[in-house]
Amino acid sequence: MKLPVRLAVWLILTVSAVLAVSAVAEDSIRLWNFDGDPPGALPKTFVVGTLVDGRPAGEWKVLKTDRAKSPPQVLAQLMGKGFEHAYKVVLIDGTTSSDLDLQVSFLPIEGKADMGGGLIWRADDDRNYYLTRANPLEQNIRIYRVVKGIRHLLQNFDQTIHLNRWHTLHVVNRGCQIQVLYDEKPVFDLCDQTFTTGLIGLWTKSDAVTYFDDLRLQILK
């Protein structure tokens, strides 16, 4: 049975539109599970920041470990020493975005002065960005704006954070509205207009050693 020409054209256009939308949606999502990266090296496009004394901001490298959330590898920050305000930052080139849905899993490994880690987004550079982080020593989650290397606390949320367990930080930022979830539990919902666009990245502090896995970025239209 032959379809009427108009109906056939409509079906073709509809299918094409659906495929185009699917392709755009897939293109707007980027995943890093670090399993295809050479162990002992930094993934391509990942750029380590600089500490105030000029040294690299951490020892970031891909690590093969049986503790990976999605085996066999993680991205690890392994520098287990640092002064109190040593922010270990790695940014990812080619991730400039404004509205986004961003998440990562992290595993606290060790640290006496500090533990845990965080997500960076809308970063101008390694000294200006938004940050949300979880700290098992303080048993809290916080969100900051970091301006010229100085943290400015936006909100705090007290939360039990178990050691030796993977956790997830999840950020959704549309316009000025920022929502943060910890293990998919909502913890922050606020508006801040300091930064409008920028790179994403990962963060630890002081002597915290942390593994990261399954980093996911979706750019929202």
Residue ranges and their predicted role:
Residues A8-A20:
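Bacterial N-terminal signal peptides
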Residues P39, P72, Q77-R142, V147:
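Secretory/extracellular carbohydrate-interaction modules
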Residues Y87-G94, Q155-I161, L202:
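Beta-strand-rich interaction surfaces with strong enrichment in secreted/lumenal proteins
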